[in-house]
Structures are given as C-alpha cells and as structure tokens.
C-alpha cells in the first residue's frame, strides 16, 4: 500500500505525537528506510516509457524560447545627458572626508572601466541587427536604428568614422581628450604604434586575432599626446567642424558633409583639408567586396586607383523612373531635402584599429513585462563568454537571505531609489571600443538578404539595373508608415553605420560586476556620511532606511542631491516609499524578518494548481519548477532538502513523476510559509558533539550522553547531536565543531533526516568550537567525569561578504551626525 501523506508527515516527525526524538530521529538516517520511502513515493523510478510532459502551466522547457512579440508602436526611451563626474573620488571626499581603501579601489575600477578579451571575432555587418521578427523586418530595422541613434546622441556610443577615428556626442572625459586629434589628418601615422598598412589591405586580412595589446597601447597613445599642449577647442579647425547635419542658411556653397545633390559625392574644400581621401564608411561584405563608400571626393578616389564610388542608394531613386505603384522612388520624391547621408559627433577621437565589422548583434524587446509601450535594446556579446577563449568574469558577493535579513530587518522606514539607465553611467576606456561594436549594413543590404525577389550580384551592386529589385509592396507599405514616424531620418537610417560602446553595455559579463562595485562604494560613502541611517544597494537597486518618516524624507533630499552632484541620474517617478516593510530583491523585509513577495507566492500557488500527478515531467520543466520553489524554500519547514528528489532527476536528466503524496507534501510545505528571522547576537551556552557511536550535550552545567544503535557516518551523528541539543534545551545558539552542520546545508544527508533536521534546527544559529575546546567532547565519548570549564563564546550575526560597515577613517569627518537640508528661510528669504 502506498505511503499516505499523513503517514509521511508522521514519519518526518512534523506532527507533535511523535515518540522521543532520541529514538525516532536516528531511524530516519537508515538507508533502507529511505530507499523504501523513495520507492513508495515513486521518487526513484526514473526510467519511464510514457511520453514526457513538456509544459506545466506557464513553464516550458528551460531552453525552449518564448516567442517575443513585436510592437510596431514601441517608444524609444529617452536617455538624459548621463555624464558621471570624472572627479567622483574628490567629490565623495568633500562629502564624507577621506575614502577607505575599498571605496577608492572600487571607484577607480570604473574610471574608466577597461575590457580585455582574449580574442575578438568580427562578424559581417549583416549580423548587426538580428532578424528576430521575420514578419516585421523593416519595421524592426528602423526601430533598432533609431534606438542606436538615440544612444549615440546621448553619448553612450562612439560612431566609427574611419579605421582609426570615431566621433561622439556629450562631454568628453580627460582620457578621451588625450586621444583627440584636430585638424591633422586621420592617417598621418608615420610615428607611433598606430601605423598600419593601407586600409584596403588591412581590412581584407582575416580578423581572427586582432586583439591589440591594449595595456601598452593606452600608454603609447597617452605618451604621444603629452608633448602637445592642445586644448579641445584649440585643436579644432574653425571651419572644419561645423555642426554637421544642419543645413546652412545661406544659399552660397554647401558646407555639409553630405551635399544636397542626389549623388552625395562632393565634400566642401575645408572638409577635404581636414579629412584627406578617407571614406567615412569603408564597409565590406563578408565576401570582401566593397558595399558602399560614401563621401569620397571623386577625383582623389579615382586618382588613387580605389574601387568605384557608388552614390547614395536612397537618393538614387530620385533620378530613376518608377517601376510600379510600389516603387520606392514615390517615397524618395516625397521630400526635396532628405538631410545628410551621415551625421558626425561633436568630438572626434583616435581609436585603436577598428575594422568595419560588428562583434555582437542587437534586437528590441519590451522594456519589461509590465511596460510593453517602451522598447529595450538587447545586446548579444555572448562571444566573450563562450568557446575556448571565453573571458572568466570576476565574481562578486551577492548577499544571501540570512545576511540580507540580519541587515535590513529592523523597525526603520524604507524608501528605494531608481537609478535610470544605471549601466550607461559607467564610462569605458576607448581602447575597448573595437571589441564592442554594433551596427547595421544599411537598409539595402538588409532587405536584399531577406527579400526573395532581389537578384543581387556582387559585381553589379549599386548599379541601376538592380536598384528596383528592392521595390516590393511590403517594403513600400512599411516605409510609408515609417515615414510618418521618422520623416527624413529614414534616409539617415538607411545608411550603414558602425557604433562602439562608450559606456558599459549590458550584454557583457563584466558589466554587472562593475555596476555592483560602483553602487556598493557609493552606498558605503552615504552610510558613513549619515551613520544613524542605512543605505544599501544591489546592482541598480538602492534603498535608504531611517528611524522616522520625516527623518527619511530629509535623508532622501540630502542623498538625492549628493547623487545628482556626482552625475548619477535618478528617476523621480520611480522612487518608492515602503513604510516599515521593504520590498527588495523579491523579498518583503520587515521587523519580523523576511518573506517572499506576494507575486511569487501567487506564482507558487498557480504552479501547484497546474502540476500533474503520475505523469512524467520533462527535466527541463523541473528546472523551472525547482527555480521557483527553491526561491521560497528557506521559508518552508523542510527547506531545500524537500526538493532533493527533483534535483536528483534533473542531475540524471530524467523525467520526474509526482506521486500524490509527494505533491501533497510539497503543496502543504509551500502553503504555510514561515518568515526567516534576523539573528540576534548572544552567548553560546549549549554545546553538542558526537562520535560515530555516541553523542554528548552540555547545557550550562548539565551534561548528557547517549549511544546510537549502530555506528553512523560522523556528519550524520553530529547533525543528530545538534538536533537533540536544540530539542532538549530550546536554545537558538548552539556550539558545534562540525563544519557541515555549521553550514546549515542539509541536502547531502539521507533525505528523510535532512527534511526533519531542517525543521528542528530552523532559526538556530551555530558557533564554531574547536574540538579540543568543546565541552561536549568528553560526554560524546562516554566520559561524564571531569567537566571542562564552560566557554564564553559570543555569537555575532553575519552580514555576509557585503563589506557593509566600512571602518570610518581615523580623520574626524567634518559632517556632524545629522542630515543637512537647506532651510527655505535661509535660502529663499532675503531681508527687505
């Protein structure tokens, strides 16, 4: 007869009417009993012949991707002018006095951040924008281009101008000013390590290992520039740097880089001086043929025997006869002035050699599940975390649940700040740019690759015969709709572009590490400035706590002003005031301890409602189920050990079948969640120890010992001794000399014992006692004779490796222990 849920509960000692613990508990360590229970609950039967179930509620296999939904009306989020102050360390020192070594080291790490991949693989431009939405190719192309353009305008990306130069918007940092070049030509490279063979040959060489020795390169670049005492302004030709992309008001000669004429071929004379025969886009297709070369003065290009120059693909339609009702020439003729073919940034900079390629693809998705009106750019630089040359990203401490509770469970009022576009605050050194390239090959190539009717041959690309091969009803309708949104920008966006990251991108494993270092250093500074308050951060989530609401508001004002003075952008609409229970990292943390947030509890209920019984479930779906249940496991009676059968099936990659009893057991576990309470400091006065054959306890001056019926593995014996000590004394601080018991991970013990021990020892804190000093050592060996002196072992709750309370420097801080905020009387009012 299968084991019923009631029997199973009684077996696990979860009911009160169990016999004496010293007899019942060792029985659960018996391997034979564990095997029989596993067979009864159908936990060990992994080889099943029935087809597997691949979907449980919303859970599908871990690797089956949910199809993202394209929204043609996505808004591109705006990025304020994010510019983190370069002298951030100096500003923090003005605020709080000298910084600690830890804070300084973390802030230096991101000023600027550096990225050293082992090998960079360059991909053709066609891979720049991923064809993620086959139904909405053109729409997705323009939306993504617009997003990239917005990022470039906000100073988050560099735009590759030539192999060795890039332009950007926003305020330059000092390391970018060292690398600025002014009116001297881009290719004057007789001296220094940047000299290279001519562009054509170097670009067509294979880019398999083009990692530059960046450390030495940065030094060279800086040294070469030190001799020249140029300021930014002095370096720039008064004529060579007009605001590009703005048509001059006069009707005289045209100073725009891209002229109004249909061919887009001529440059103004002063531009020609600043940029000798250099193409803005030396783009190459994967086969090595030139795709488009814009803005080359025709005489110089031809005289140097370069490839033929093709005029602008978009504007060519103006001079051609419409091929049908859906010809693109109808759209091109809508406007007289389509603006420039390319825009250029406010500042120019020399870069290490940057091929006309990309290193990662981009696509758009919803900003988050609750906000589908705005888009988010997904950047895939996964090449750096895969294969033989993968970069092993630095590890960083994530506070565990107990540390988090010890730290934040208090009677403070809480408020959380939202840092807008947190990743894009941290600047990257320009030498990293050639490794983090995104972009697109231009609309013509994009459409040509993906449309079925285009007969595109390399030798006749850009010529008139196949210009109209692009025309199709779908493209025409899409462009007409997009024209309403983007207007004359359609022309700009239809050109190829290559952009490199100037701030840290989200798709690289280094970025979360750097962000965590940055925000933890800033919070450490804030905590020392306001010693009676608490500031804590995890990634871009920053929380502030204070004793009273009015106190919290003034702290909020002071901290916000401080963060703004550093150049950190906060999103005021998303500041949340939590009262006394803080919502943070998926938990609700109050003075009673922590519990999972409500939406997670609802998800768990939903999961159990849909969970089928007696049907084999695909192990990938089990991974999803364990992911959800594992998050809430610390709040249940039996904790992680209860999920061990599921872990075992995932490890062996077999299907798992829920028996009615096991499902009822889990269901009951997760219906009643107990808060994880904060640990309190105290003195340890109860000690436990064991040998394979016996156990011993010391409770104050009382000592006890006992023997096991059969010898047990030492870790199991130590765990049993700890359980006896807890149930006999009721003390919540125990001393033990066993590291496994100390770790409170009971998943490696026999399954039934692990589940029962987790419930008995829930909320117990352990202190390590070396065996030689453990008062329970003698009783465990059967000797009750001599009593050792009792140790006074203090227990201090841990806050993990979050390096929270940085020691204040010895220099007295010049800020008194209170919040400063400008009184309106002192600031606004003037005596008459």
UniProtKB/Swiss-Prot annotation:
Domain called Reverse transcriptase: residue spans: 346-589
The UniProt keywords, alphabetically, are:
DNA replication, DNA-binding, DNA-directed DNA polymerase, Endonuclease, Host-virus interaction, Hydrolase, Inhibition of host innate immune response by virus, Inhibition of host RLR pathway by virus, Magnesium, Metal-binding, Multifunctional enzyme, Nuclease, Nucleotidyltransferase, RNA-directed DNA polymerase, Transferase, Viral immunoevasion
Q: Per the record, which residues fall in region Disordered?
A: 186-229
Site residues by UniProt (Priming of reverse-transcription by covalently linking the first nucleotide of the (-)DNA) = 63
| E.C. designation(s) | 2.7.7.7, 2.7.7.49, 3.1.26.4
Q: Which InterPro entries match?
A: DNA/RNA_pol_sf (IPR043502), DNApol_viral_C (IPR001462), DNApol_viral_N (IPR000201), HBV_DPOL (IPR037531), Rev_trsase/Diguanyl_cyclase (IPR043128), RT_dom (IPR000477), Viral_Replic_Matur_Polypro (IPR051320)
Q: Which domain of life does this protein belong to? A: Viruses
Q: Where is this region: Spacer?
A: 178-335
Q: Which reaction does it catalyse?
A: DNA(n) + a 2'-deoxyribonucleoside 5'-triphosphate = DNA(n+1) + diphosphate; Endonucleolytic cleavage to 5'-phosphomonoester
Membrane-spanning residues? none
Annotated region (Polymerase/reverse transcriptase domain (RT)) at: 336-679
Q: Where does Mg(2+) bind?
A: 418, 540-541
- Modes of activity regulation: Activated by host HSP70 and HSP40 in vitro to be able to bind the epsilon loop of the pgRNA. Because deletion of the RNase H region renders the protein partly chaperone-independent, the chaperones may be needed indirectly to relieve occlusion of the RNA-binding site by this domain. Inhibited by several reverse-transcriptase inhibitors: Lamivudine, Adefovir and Entecavir.
Task: Give the region (Terminal protein domain (TP)) as residue ranges.
Answer: 1-177
One Pfam family of this chain: DNA_pol_viral_C
Query: Domain notes, please?
Result: Terminal protein domain (TP) is hepadnavirus-specific. Spacer domain is highly variable and separates the TP and RT domains. Polymerase/reverse-transcriptase domain (RT) and ribonuclease H domain (RH) are similar to retrovirus reverse transcriptase/RNase H. The polymerase/reverse transcriptase (RT) and ribonuclease H (RH) domains are structured in five subdomains: finger, palm, thumb, connection and RNase H. Within the palm subdomain, the 'primer grip' region is thought to be involved in the positioning of the primer terminus for accommodating the incoming nucleotide. The RH domain stabilizes the association of RT with primer-template.
Sum up the protein's function in the record's words: Multifunctional enzyme that converts the viral RNA genome into dsDNA in viral cytoplasmic capsids. This enzyme displays a DNA polymerase activity that can copy either DNA or RNA templates, and a ribonuclease H (RNase H) activity that cleaves the RNA strand of RNA-DNA heteroduplexes in a partially processive 3'- to 5'-endonucleasic mode. Neo-synthesized pregenomic RNA (pgRNA) are encapsidated together with the P protein, and reverse-transcribed inside the nucleocapsid.
Further remark, if any? Answer: Hepadnaviral virions contain probably just one P protein molecule per particle.
Similarity comment: Belongs to the hepadnaviridae P protein family.
Q: Write down what this protein is called.
A: Protein P
Q: Please report the organism this UniProt entry assigns to the protein.
A: Hepatitis B virus genotype D (isolate Germany/1-91/1991)
According to the entry, what is the taxonomic lineage of the organism?
Viruses, Riboviria, Pararnavirae, Artverviricota, Revtraviricetes
